[in-house]
């Protein structure tokens, strides 16, 4: 399995490719990592050093990869935070190049726009880029509840609201190949206190998975869930199984992180959770 992952990179900690690449490699995937930035640490610390790469830099790296003649072997493209319109455009150009070489390749887009309580935290114009250009190109989307609501204009108070919003979003996605949406964090009227729901949609079917809500809010968790879900969907061909495997692994990762009181997810220390999760969760038809 070969996955082209175009995301940010940090020297210290685990966000973007620094969160996604190691679990994917541990599970057996070859990862072709293209970094959109190289920072000392994630921006949640308030200060950092490093470089932001431009769209031309990404295009040059993609040309080099294409020159090796390997794009027909690429099974999927994974993208997350897009730092600028130029980077977003270069990522979508990369998706087009991969699909030209392998029409069966999937594009998994984590539409990083914002979050409940924080609102939109990306640059002006990027939410619209996701909505108008990335979503119509994607086979797999992994929004959180805030992003689902923003992309569709539907407020999700109940599970029925969330299902309706997901169907609206699915209609905006690519027509060729699968159309899969994973809502990575959902809290609606039916969600018990102290719990967190995840909702996945494929082929007209919805599955809900519920875990305890852990006392941790940490950068990089969304990058990990998107990468793991993509891997397991490629591996099993089934969104329900992919959700169960990815959610179980990330729960174990975050539980270990919370117990340690760490400011960074313990991607390496908790590596066994990616292979054999200590707690397994199962999704139900909803």
Swiss-Prot record:
It comes from the Bacteria. GO terms for cellular component: cytosol. GO terms for biological process: pyridoxal 5'-phosphate salvage. CDD domains: pyridoxal_pyridoxamine_kinase. Keywords: ATP-binding, Kinase, Magnesium, Nucleotide-binding, Transferase. Its cofactor is Mg(2+). Disulfide bonds: none annotated. It catalyses: pyridoxal + ATP = pyridoxal 5'-phosphate + ADP + H(+). Its EC number is 2.7.1.35. ATP binds at residues 110, 147. One of its GO terms (molecular function) is pyridoxal kinase activity. The keyword Nucleotide-binding applies. Substrate binds at residues 8, 223. Pathway: Cofactor metabolism; pyridoxal 5'-phosphate salvage; pyridoxal 5'-phosphate from pyridoxal: step 1/1. InterPro entries: PM/HMP-P_kinase-1, PyrdxlKinase, Pyridoxal_kinase_PdxY, Ribokinase-like. It holds the Pfam family Phos_pyr_kin. NCBIfam families: PRK05756.1, pyridox_kin. Pyridoxal kinase involved in the salvage pathway of pyridoxal 5'-phosphate (PLP). Catalyzes the phosphorylation of pyridoxal to PLP. Belongs to the pyridoxine kinase family. PdxY subfamily. Homodimer. This is Pyridoxal kinase PdxY.
